[in-house]
């Protein structure tokens, strides 16, 4: 089982161009560069191609759409190019984008749940690969079984990955339900449904010096910048991978403690955007 992986620097924010092959109305591709799940890009049909370019080479080892309406049979193909825009550095071929089905919150139809990002619905498409330094990226998505009849995504994450030498010693996932419970004057219990999101903390123990330095570089960045965390990347248990993959912000500062003989420990906690 691979160790956890983190993308802490989203290269989409530095892209010179971000273009979608088709766009429905005003739901523009530029929304993919926003760190929100309420602003989406929507294609006109069940396939779309995203093309990104950069002025300088970007290290890339992951492409993810953490909030999308793709079905379990949707495919994603990622191609990375050199500076001339024609030399292929990496080609994933067409593979399943998010084989674990989207969760279906109570009260939603299957089609509605596919894009119920604020209530625990939606899917997370991802592709992990050996890092390349690319000037251009092309992402092809095909989802002929899409329940809504079009491809939709709220965020695009592209960047280098970091994985510690030793995996997390402990982790959990919390479902944060903002429903408010109250009582009426007649004594009845009332519920005002709220949004739902997740929080995933991970404990890292016995980090060697190289991991300590890399982790410290990461947390020196403001908590304003979201990170993509996958505790069980490419795991055979697809639901486990889905449930412990999260795109969000650090909820608190991370102390790095010296343990013994050059080994360090810390805790990282991410709450979904």
Task: Give the residues covered by each predicted segment.
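Extracellular/virion structural assembly segments
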Residues: 1-48, 55-273
């Amino acid at each position: 089982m691979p160790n956890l992986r983190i993308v802490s620097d989203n290269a989409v924010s530095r892209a010179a161009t971000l273009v979608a092959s088709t766009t429905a109305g005003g739901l523009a591709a530029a929304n993919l560069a926003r760190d929100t799940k309420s602003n989406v890009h929507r294609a006109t049909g069940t396939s779309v191609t995203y093309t990104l370019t950069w002025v300088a080479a970007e290290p890339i080892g992951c492409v993810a759409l953490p909030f999308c309406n793709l079905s379990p049979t949707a495919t994603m193909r990622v191609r990375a190019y050199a500076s001339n825009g024609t030399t292929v550095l990496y080609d994933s071929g067409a593979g399943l984008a998010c084989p674990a089905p989207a969760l279906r919150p109570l009260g939603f139809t299957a089609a509605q749940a596919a894009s119920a990002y604020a209530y625990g619905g939606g899917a997370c498409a991802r592709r992990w690969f050996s890092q390349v330094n690319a000037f251009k990226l092309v992402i092809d998505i095909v989802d002929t079984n899409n329940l809504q009849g079009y491809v939709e995504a709220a965020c695009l994450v592209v960047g280098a990955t970091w994985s510690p030498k030793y995996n997390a010693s402990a982790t959990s996932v919390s479902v944060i339900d903002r429903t408010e419970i109250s009582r009426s004057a007649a004594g009845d219990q009332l519920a005002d449904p709220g949004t739902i999101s997740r929080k995933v903390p991970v404990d890292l123990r016995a980090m060697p010096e190289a991991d300590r330095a890399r982790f410290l570089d990461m947390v020196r960045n403001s908590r304003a910048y979201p990170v993509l965390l996958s505790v069980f990347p490419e795991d055979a248990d697809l639901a486990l991978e889905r449930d412990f993959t999260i795109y969000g912000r650090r909820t608190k500062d991370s102390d790095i403690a010296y343990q013994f003989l050059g080994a360090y420990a810390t805790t990282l906690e991410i709450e979904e955007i």
